[in-house]
Amino acid sequence: MVSSAAFESLDPQKIVRCLEGTRVDVLGQLRRWIDEENGGDSTTPNAPVFWINGSAGTGKTMLAYTFADECRRRGIPVTSFFCSRYFAERSNPNLIFTSIAHHLAQTFPSFGVRLAEVLRSNPHLASASVPYQLEELIINPLRSTHDSFRLCLIVTDALDECKDEGTTSIILSSLSRYVSEISPLKILVTSRLEQSITSVFASRSGHLNAASQRLVLHELELGVV
């Protein structure tokens, strides 16, 4: 578990929030998305995954931090992993699902009980493959405690800053396999347009293509604040 990767642990002096009156359209899209019940069609605002991508300096982390903090203030539970190439733990993609599972266990007691049972029976999951981590640490506990869950936002920011592009692609491919089962969780992903990431979202054979909304920030720079 990497507590330093959660948005609450980030130094607010180093993360600039969106100023009032800026990014109004983008934040409005995110608010509409979080307030809609999960669906699975990218043509509607209720897809369970929202992918914000763009070139360097377009404000992806600023938006992710601002929206996560806004949801927290609204009483929506937020679990987050802010990747950073400058910190070893925050650039290790193998720690993303373990950290998210830990945060979910702290937020939802029934999930925590089930997760503890899983870890007692298999204490080596922290070193398991990423797909197996997702299934055992998040999906299976979620299946058995679904009725006790409510809306929760999961933020994975700057996914492209993970040090292993191959594992980054595996993370998204694994998520694609289970995306129809994550309700009432909603997942916000931000990244640059790296091939290892865009290929998974664009794949017609996976489920992320049809279960995600997308926003390309650098295409909005001239016309949208």
Residue ranges and their predicted role:
Residues 1-225:
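Conserved NB-ARC/NACHT P-loop NTPase core of NLR-like innate immune receptors
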